[in-house]
Each structure stands twice: as structure tokens, then as C-alpha cells.
């Protein structure tokens, strides 16, 4: 199908837009896509001179083709048309030199790897984890008992990946936390801040550097109050000097003995008076074989700003990094050859380790002294923490501020300032220790065993495929517009905060709810929840035009046809904007208001009509050219004729407009005043506050026009999806109407939220609220008998594994077993949450869906999973010229779907059907035949081992299971419902009441006894003058059972009990 648009009124050339045919050359098509790589410098200079020689410095579609052919750059008609539309961004069908060069620049920008590094979410986006420190006093030291070193030999350094397979938080992989306080108490914690054990020791601060392989000597660096730095080197082989020696559980040694060589395993080295003040931080880099030491110089009168805040020592050569007030903390990133410093002057400085004279960048923004800095080299981010507990995140290359995190001020008391920080590079966690332990995730890795990653930072609302640039555009509720290359999985362009609104001085992002392309697919139109509309040149993220419907009314659907833009939403009417040069900034045209509720969806049939549907189930068909309605239906009673009648509010508004117009007719300024009065009346119309009553309406979730079906009475050309799970089919003919409906879901409460078809309307693709993707074969559905064609089921079974027979009829097939048409050819669960948008790419046969679970996924038409846009995993190479999916390829399942997938979903996504028993001619199954073969082989092996056959019984006397009953019990399952209740198939036998035995006499006597008969109270009196409690013997109570020997013995025992409580009373006092 091709659509022809005239280039302009004055030109005779026409631009023909059509999709790619499969017969085109891949190499030639690739050349047009990569023109910025194929063109040379000499050719570019000749092109520039050709543009200068033109009369108006711009050329048309034919002139540009002649200029390119003179430089041996040739294309066929289809490819050249696509190339011209990409270059002509002004839509005037004239190309100047600036447009041509801009197209070449955009080609280089798409390949910029820095665009792939921009994160969708803030580096610190998760809530912190807080727990008690279990120390009596505040924690003064925090360290990590590492299992693996952060420093890796250069020959073992590989490309860092931003995902993990789980298990990295185990103690064997991530190590244990160690906290110490001033009272000499040490506690060991897991990576999840769970206590392990407690020990007593003295707190001390050191720095330790080692390799995992043990081939390089480990370094223990010590700094003291006098500015001295000592390095203790030893070999970690066989635990080095820390080997256990018999008879010596503890070895005490002083530094002087180590210098004398009494312990030969140690190799000491001293740097006396390296600093003039107390050493604040030390580090030894094994990559550069360099020692870093820093100190604070707060006495400005003494040092006058010429203090060596940090010193790097390499082979007895010192490099001084002079920083005013010195350095409190630093971080060395060996992979980038940089060091980041922070000190009391509130500045964060980035240095090249080989250029100590001047920093590469100075990051400003803190209001307090810097107490911690660390770098994530793989993410190109710098984190800094100041004395006021404010965390700032910076971009390492751009030197810009990315985030300011201030939740520590809320979690920690303002009087608690002496905190200890430690960054775990393996888990990417920042741990803050004081009277509490707080763990903060800093740009955590993606767990690929749980998810494939996210496409957006919020639910995806719209996904579109651009046939001109061959890319996917996704819009989300996070107010992001992202352009993806589906063939390589790369992210080309990301536009953040596309729709914004200022509330109380703060800029708030507005969700994008609708989007579409212009007829030539050069520009993007988006609608937001606040009623705003924007036209984007999304190749360079420039807003071309701003529009709006009624304020604070959500835009639910947008339609862009030739010279017109239609927008509708919660304002209950269609708003038409001009798209003609010179008239685009006029007042929009409001179509008549026939709807009585919010419009939820709409669609267009090019050249014929528009259909709109509301939340209350109203459907209205409109003429596209005139904007007049011609049919109206209700989905609750689709066969009933409903008169087209304006709402009471609309009739009142029209009467007021006519009355006002008649008054202004007698005045001189008729036209000017009528226009002003009309606009003021539109703005001051009252809101429609109607009462819907107690009946809950059936809302319409999605509508779809079949573009290839004609406007006749017998052709079902409009599909209406209801929230009950049914899809109704209508004819948009003036005398047409409701035709039929079918059930499109198989779970109670589910419904279809989005629909699309292929270019020839052979298949219908639906996405449901429960995350299911269904494919329907609609070639013979709602068409006249003369147009129905034969359905080749074997061919469909080869493509759709869902149609292949199974041992038991699955739930999706049971739901549609009584529906002859349309034919359900595929059904599987693609997302955990609702699917908000679905689209289809014709030539490679790819379905892509946008869901409420923040992801946009690609599938083959048969249901195989291709990938998630934005994933950190390698992308399977695709091409727009060949069909996606190879039957010989083993397909992977999304990790989140794998845990909840049914047997049908597992079969469709994996492309593998479980083996079932198949009957053969002799009446035995394949499994029985294989078992008999195995038994025959066992008997043959026994005969080889034994000379004579073994006499029966071989195993002696043993228990034998009873034989089966002669009568075969046939179970009939009740399949009338969507599920089978198992308990209805169970045989339940009635129970009889058990005979109650008489109660024994001993038990009866014990039940009638009263413990008060054996209780003798004790009367006590406290002597205030003394320190003991004097208990006096009570008088004997006369009882009938006083002669009992048990009571006498008890009383006698009480008389001999010593009653001395003085010691206990004294201890308690």
C-alpha cells in the first residue's frame, strides 16, 4: 500500500511514500541509511559548491538527485524518496545546505556511545536500609573484610558489565562488614546488615592493598599523627608471616624489630615527615605502584595556601597536589588514571595523576567540608558526601550535577556529625555508620536472573514504529520520549521532561498519554495528561509547536491526517488544529459536542471517517472531511438506534452564541467582535456535573479501524474492545451497524486494552490487562461469503506452535472452543502487568509491546521472545529486510515470566512442545515399547553373566501389590467453567458418630477435687527497722482433714526451711 502526497502547489514533482519491498538490495539500502559514512571529504566540498551555485541556495527533490548522481551517489526511486524525506525537516520539499549537513551530523550523533550511558533513573533512587548499630557508643571505624580485592591485574581487566546473575551478596563474594566503637567493641555483619558475632579489640585505621592471585606482594599502609607514612610489604603465599606456629597463639612485635629484620617475611619502608600534619587518608595503587597520602592543613596563616594536600610517591619521586586547606579524603580510579579529592574547602577536584599542577575539573555546590568521595568508573559517576550529610552525584566526563540526595539529614539526628562512611564497590552500596547503620544503593546493577531490565522509569504508555527512519519510539508516564534502534537494541535519543507544569514554583513532569506520527512520519505528536500537545522533531529533540485542548483535561487520543490534527480526551469533544503553513497558529476548531462522557479512545479511516468512544460506552462515527456525526451506538445495546442529539450544555451554548451573534449583527465591527465573544464564551462555559445514577456503564477500552476493508454493510471494519473482555465488530457504513462480538480473553476480569493489525489486515494483535498477547486470524471474519478464502491449517501450525495438539485442552483454547471465527492462533503471557500499547512491523514480522511494568518487549509473530529494549544483555541481531526468528534457534524466556508461565506460555515462547504419548498401530504407546526394549536388553545381559538360568522366584517371597479392579472407572471432568474444581471429583464418605466411653472413677474424683482444701496461706509482716523480712508462723487452721499425714509432713517441712533473705535484699539494694 502506498500513499502519495503532493510536494507543494507550485511544484510538479510528487513524493511517493511506501514501505520497503523484500526485493530491494540490502547493501544499497544500508548505503542510504549510512550516508554520513559513505560520503567523502572531496564529495562534500563539491556538494557545497553545488548548493552555492543554485539560484536560491536550495534545491528540490529532482535537483538534489541530479547533484548526487554527478558524484556517483545513486539510489533507486524508493530509497531516494526515503532519503529526501529524512533530509527535508522543514517539510517545504526544498533542501538547503544546512538541512543536508544536519542530516549527516545526526547520523554521527546516533553512533555516539555516550548516549547509551545516560540513565533513565537517578543514581540513588531506592530507599535506604536503616538498622541499629548494637554498640553502646557511636561507631568510630567502619571497614570491610574483603573476600576479593578491588584491584585486578591489568592483564586480567575485562570490560565491566552493568548486570549480575545474583549471589554476589553472599559472604564468600562480598565479604563482611566490621564496625568498631570507642569502648573497644567490634561487631561483624553480613552484607545485608545482619549481625554475625562480636569481639573486643582496639580500634585502628589502616589501608590494605592486595591482588586475588597472590603473585604480587600485599601492602599494608600506616599513617600517624606526625605525618609519617609506613609501608609494610609481604608475600601472601601460604599466609605469609601470619602462619600459625605451635605454642604461640599471639605474636607481638614492635616496629623497630621489623626494621631490624627480625621477621624476614616483612619488607618495611618508611616515609618520614611526608606531611607536616596528621595523615588523613592513605592508599597504595598496585597498578601504578604508587603511594597516595593526604593531610588537612587548616592553619591558613601558617601555610598560606601553599600546602601539599596530597602527595603521590612513585619510585622515590614525589608529586605534590597543592590544595588550600588540604585534603580530607580522596579516591583513585586506576582505569581512568584520575584521582578525585575533597577537603574542608567544600570543593571536589578531579586530577590527572600525571598532571599534579592543575586539576582537570572543580565541582562546586557543597555547603560543607567534604568527608567522602568515590567514583564508579563503569558508570562515569562521582559521588561526594559533605559534613552536613548531603550526597551529590556528578557526571565524570561532563562535570555536571546529576542528583542531590538529602535523606540522610532526615534519618540521622542533627547533633550526630562524626559519622563513618564506606563504599562497597562490589555491591555498589554506601554504608553510613553512627548510632545507626544505613545502607544506600548507588546505581545498583540489574539482576538478570530476575528481570531483563526496564525501558522507561515509569509505565510505558505508547509505542510506535517509524517506517521512514526504521526505529521505535516509546513514550512513558515518566514524561520521556526515547528513540530505539530495534535492529541493534541501541538507544538513539532520549528526551526527558517533555511535558512539564509549574506548581508552587516547582517544575513537575506530566505523563504522556497519547502519541502519533505525521502522514510522512517526519514529526512526532504527543499529548499529555494536562491537555497539552507538542509537535517534536525527535531527531534533534526540538519542539516545533505547542498546542492545548481544554486545560487539565487528559488527552487520550491524537490523529494526524493531511493538513489537520485531531485531539480528543476528557473534554468530551474533538478539537481540530490546522497543519497548513501560515494558518497553524489560529484558533482550533471544536467539533460538535455529542458525547456525554469522557472520550477514552479514537481511530481514523483515511479519507472516510473517524470513530470515537467514551467511558460510558457511547460510540459515534464522524465524517472526516466535514466533522459531522452520522451514526451513534451504545455498546450495552448495540442494535438499538440512538438519535444524534446535542447535549443540553451544547444546545445552551449554541443558543447563546446565536443570540449574541444576532445582537452583534447590527453593530459595525461584526466579524471582530463575534470572534472575541466566541472565544470568551468558550473559556467561560460551565462544567458538566451530571449524575450517572447507580448503573455502572460498560466502558470502551480501544477501537481499531481496518484500513483495507471497504465501507459496505457486510464488511466488519471497526473493532470495539470492551472492559468485559468482549470485542464488538461494527460496519462504519451509514446504514451499517453492529455485526457480531467475540470473547477475546480467557481469564475472568481481563480485557483488551490495545489492538493493532498488519498491513493487509490478516491478523489481529491484542494486548490485555493481565499481560497476555493474543493473535487472531481475521481473513474470513466478518466478510461476505464470496470473499472468504481457504485456510491452510498445516501452514498456520508451522508458524504458530499454539495450534498444535496437546494431551489436554488448555485454558486459552477452552475459552474459544465454541467460537468458529475469528481463529485464535497464538496466546501467551508477555508481561506481568497490563499491556498499554502494541504495534507490528510488517516485513520482519515483529510484534512489540509497551507495558505497565516499565518495559517494551519484542516478539516474533509466532510468539518467540526477541528481547527487551534497554536491556543490559547482548542483543540478537535483527534486520528490517528479513523475517525475524529462526526455528533452529533456542529461544530464551523473560526471567519474570518464567516464574509464572503456564504450559501454554512455556510452549509458545520457547518454541518447544512437550512430548506426549502417541498411539501406534499395535495398541501400545511409545513409552511402553521403549520399556519392553529396555527389559529385553537387561535379560540378555543377565544371560551373559550367568551360565544357567536362575530359578524362580528370584527375589524370594515378597509383598505383591493387589491387581487392579476389572471395572474401569471413567472420570468426566466438568469443563463448562473457566476452571475445573478438583474437589467436585472426590468421593466423600459419610462419617458416623463415635461411641463415647465412660469416664473412669479416678478421673471423676480428680475433677471434683478443690485445690483450696490443700492450700495453707502464709501471713507475713515487714520489720521496718531491720534489713530482713520477718515471716511469722500462722496459727493452725482447723480442718476436717487436719489428721491427714500428707498435711503433717508438709507443715513439718515448712518449719525447717530457713527464712533468711538478708543477703538477697542487700544485693538488690
From Swiss-Prot:
Annotated tissue distribution: Strongly expressed in testis and weakly in the soma.
Swiss-Prot/TrEMBL WD repeat ranges: 155-199, 322-361, 365-404, 455-494, 507-546, 594-634, 747-786, 830-869
Xref: InterPro entries: EF-hand-dom_pair, Quinoprotein_ADH-like_sf, WD-EF-hand_domain, WD40/YVTN_repeat-like_dom_sf, WD40_repeat_dom_sf, WD40_rpt
Biased composition (Polar residues): 664-674
Record flagged with keyword rRNA-binding: no
Keyword Repeat: yes
Additional detail: Chromosome mapping suggests that WDY is fully contained in the kl-1 region, and WDY may correspond to this fertility factor.
Protein name as it appears in the record: WD repeat-containing protein on Y chromosome
Amino acid at each position: 500500500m502506498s500513499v502519495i502526497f503532493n510536494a507543494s502547489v507550485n511544484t510538479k514533482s510528487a513524493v511517493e511514500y511506501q514501505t520497503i519491498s523484500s526485493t530491494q538490495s540490502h547493501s544499497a539500502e544500508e548505503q542510504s541509511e549510512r550516508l554520513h559514512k559513505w560520503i567523502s571529504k572531496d564529495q562534500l566540498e563539491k556538494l557545497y559548491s553545488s548548493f552555492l551555485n543554485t539560484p536560491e541556495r536550495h534545491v528540490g527533490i529532482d535537483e538534489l538527485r541530479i547533484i548526487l548522481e554527478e558524484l556517483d551517489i545513486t539510489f533507486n526511486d524508493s530509497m531516494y524518496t526515503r532519503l529526501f524525506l529524512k533530509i527535508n525537516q522543514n517539510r517545504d520539499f526544498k533542501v538547503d545546505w544546512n538541512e543536508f549537513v544536519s542530516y549527516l551530523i545526526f547520523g554521527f550523533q546516533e553512533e555516539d556511545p555516550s548516549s547509551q550511558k545516560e540513565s533513565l533513573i537517578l543514581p540513588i533512587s531506592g530507599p535506604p536500609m536503616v538498622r541499629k548499630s548494637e554498640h553502646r557508643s557511636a561507631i568510630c571505624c567502619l571497614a570491610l573484610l574483603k573476600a576479593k580485592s578491588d584491584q585486578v591485574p591489568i592483564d586480567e581487566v575485562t570490560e565491566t558489565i552493568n548486570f549480575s546473575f545474583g549471589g554476589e551478596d553472599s559472604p564468600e563474594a562480598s565479604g563482611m562488614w566490621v564496625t568498631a566503637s570507642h569502648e573497644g567493641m567490634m561487631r561483624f555483619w553480613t552484607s545485608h546488615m545482619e549481625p554475625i558475632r562480636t569481639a573486643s579489640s582496639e580500634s585502628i585505621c589502616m589501608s590494605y592493598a592486595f591482588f586475588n592471585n597472590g603473585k604480587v606482594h600485599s601492602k599494608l599502609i600506616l599513617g600517624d599523627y606526625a605525618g609519617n607514612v609506613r609501608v609494610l610489604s609481604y608475600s601472601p603465599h601460604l599466609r605469609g608471616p601470619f602462619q600459625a606456629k605451635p605454642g604461640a597463639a599471639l605474636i607481638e612485635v614492635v616496629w623497630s624489630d621489623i626494621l631490624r629484620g627480625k621477621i624476614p617475611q616483612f619488607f618495611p619502608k618508611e616515609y618520614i615527615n611526608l606531611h607536616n600534619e596528621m595523615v588523613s587518608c592513605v592508599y597504595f595503587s598496585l597498578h601504578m605502584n604508587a603511594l597516595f597520602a593526604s593531610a588537612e592543613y587548616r592553619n591558613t596563616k601558617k601555610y598560606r595556601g601553599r600546602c601539599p594536600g596530597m602527595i603521590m610517591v612513585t619510585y622515590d619521586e614525589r608529586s605534590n597536589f597543592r590544595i588550600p586547606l588540604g585534603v580530607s579524603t580522596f579516591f583513585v580510579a586506576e582505569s581512568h588514571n584520575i584521582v578525585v579529592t575533597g577537603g574542608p574547602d567544600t570543593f571536589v577536584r578531579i586530577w590527572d595523576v600525571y598532571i599534579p599542577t592543575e586539576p582537570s575539573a572543580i565541582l562546586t555546590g557543597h555547603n560543607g567540608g567534604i568527608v567522602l568521595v568515590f567514583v564508579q568508573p563503569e558508570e562515569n559517576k562521582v559521588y561526594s558526601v559533605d559534613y552536613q550529610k548531603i550526597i551529590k552525584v556528578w557526571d565524570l566526563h561532563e562535570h555536571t550535577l546529576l542528583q542531590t540526595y538529602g535523606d540522610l539529614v532526615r534519618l540521622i539526628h542533627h547533633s550526630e556529625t562524626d559519622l563513618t562512611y564506606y563504599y562497597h564497590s562490589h555491591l555498589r552500596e554506601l554504608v553510613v555508620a553512627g548510632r545507626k547503620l544505613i545502607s544506600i544503593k548507588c546505581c545498583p546493577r540489574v539482576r538478570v536472573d530476575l528481570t531483563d531490565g526496564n525501558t522507561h522509569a515509569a509505565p510505558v504508555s505508547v509505542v510506535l514504529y517509524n517506517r521512514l527512519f526504521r526505529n521505535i519510539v516509546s513514550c512513558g508516564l515518566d514524561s520521556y520520549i526515547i528513540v530505539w534502534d530495534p535492529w541493534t537494541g541501541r538507544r538513539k535519543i532520549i528526551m526527558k521532561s517533555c511535558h512539564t507544569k509549574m506548581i508552587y514554583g516547582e517544575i513537575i513532569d506530566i505523563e504522556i498519554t497519547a502519541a502519533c506520527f505525521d502522514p510522512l512520519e517526519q514529526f512526532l505528536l504527543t499529548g499529555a495528561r494536562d491537555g497539552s500537545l507538542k509537535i517534536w522533531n525527535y531527531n534533534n529533540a526540538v519542539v516545533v509547536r505547542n498546542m492545548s485542548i481544554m486545560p487539565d483535561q487528559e488527552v487520550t487520543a491524537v490523529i494526524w491526517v493531511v493538513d489537520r490534527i485531531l485531539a480528543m480526551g476528557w473534554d468530551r469533544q474533538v478539537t481540530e488544529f490546522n497543519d497548513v503553513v501560515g494558518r497553524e497558529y489560529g484558533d482550533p476548531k471544536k467539533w460538535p459536542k455529542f458525547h456525554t462522557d469522557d472520550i477514552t479512545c479514537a481511530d481514523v479511516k483515511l479519507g472516510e471517517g473517524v470513530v470515537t468512544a467514551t467511558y460510558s460506552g457511547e460510540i459515534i462515527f464522524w465524517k472526516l472531511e466535514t466533522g459531522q456525526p452520522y451514526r451513534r451506538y451504545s455498546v450495552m445495546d448495540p442494535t438499538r438506534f440512538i438519535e444524534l442529539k446535542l447535549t443540553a450544555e451544547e444546545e445552551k451554548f449554541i443558543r447563546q452564541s446565536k443570540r449574541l451573534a444576532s445582537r452583534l449583527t447590527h453593530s459595525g465591527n461584526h466579524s471582530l467582535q463575534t470572534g472575541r465573544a466566541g472565544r470568551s464564551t468558550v473559556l467561560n462555559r460551565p462544567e458538566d456535573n451530571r449524575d450517572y445514577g447507580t448503573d455502572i456503564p460498560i466502558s470502551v477500552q480501544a477501537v481499531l479501524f481496518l484500513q483495507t476493508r471497504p465501507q459496505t454493510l457486510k464488511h466488519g471494519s471497526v473493532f470495539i474492545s470492551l472492559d468485559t473482555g468482549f470485542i464488538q465488530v461494527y460496519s462504519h457504513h451509514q446504514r451499517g451497524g453492529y455485526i457480531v462480538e467475540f470473547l477475546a480473553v480467557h481469564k475472568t476480569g481481563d480485557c483488551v486494552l490495545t489492538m493493532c493489525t498488519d498491513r493487509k489486515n490478516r491478523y489481529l494483535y491484542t494486548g490485555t490487562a493481565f499481560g497476555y498477547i493474543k493473535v487472531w486470524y481475521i481473513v474470513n471474519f466478518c466478510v461476505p461469503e464470496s470473499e472468504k478464502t481457504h485456510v491452510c491449517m498445516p501452514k498456520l501450525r508451522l508458524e504458530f506452535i499454539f495450534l498444535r495438539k496437546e494431551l489436554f485442552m488448555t485454558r486459552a483454547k477452552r475459552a474459544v472452543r465454541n467460537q468458529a471465527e475469528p481463529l485464535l492462533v497464538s496466546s501467551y503471557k508477555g508481561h506481568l502487568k497490563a499491556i498499554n500499547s502494541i504495534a507490528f512491523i510488517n516485513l520482519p514480522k515483529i510484534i512489540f509491546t509497551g507495558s505497565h511494568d516499565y518495559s517494551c518487549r519484542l516478539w516474533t509473530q509466532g510468539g518467540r521472545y526477541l528481547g527487551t529494549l534497554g536491556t543490559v544483555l547482548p542483543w540478537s541481531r535483527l534486520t528490517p529486510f528479513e523475517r525475524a526468528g529462526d526455528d533452529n534457534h533456542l529461544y530464551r524466556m523473560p526471567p519474570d515470566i518464567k516464574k509464572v508461565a503456564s504450559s501454554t506460555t512455556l510452549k509458545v515462547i520457547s518454541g518447544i512442545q512437550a512430548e506426549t504419548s502417541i498411539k501406534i498401530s499395535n495398541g501400545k504407546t511409545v513409552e511402553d515399547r521403549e520399556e519392553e526394549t529396555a527389559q529385553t536388553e537387561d535379560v540378555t545381559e543377565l544371560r551373559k553373566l550367568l551360565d544357567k538360568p536362575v530359578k524362580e522366584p528370584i527375589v524370594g517371597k515378597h509383598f505383591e501389590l493387589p491387581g487392579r479392579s476389572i471395572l474401569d472407572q471413567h472420570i468426566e471432568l466438568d469443563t463448562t467453567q473457566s476452571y475445573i474444581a478438583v474437589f467436585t471429583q472426590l468421593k466423600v464418605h459419610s462419617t458416623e458418630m463415635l461411641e463415647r466411653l465412660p469416664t473412669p472413677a479416678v478421673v471423676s474424683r480428680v475433677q471434683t477435687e478443690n485445690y483450696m482444701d490443700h492450700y495453707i496461706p502464709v501471713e507475713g509482716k515487714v520489720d521496718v527497722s531491720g534489713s530482713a523480712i520477718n515471716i511469722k508462723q500462722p496459727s493452725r487452721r482447723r480442718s476436717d482433714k487436719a489428721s491427714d499425714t500428707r498435711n503433717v509432713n508438709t507443715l513439718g517441712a515448712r518449719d525447717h526451711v530457713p527464712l533468711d533473705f538478708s543477703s538477697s535484699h542487700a544485693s538488690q539494694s
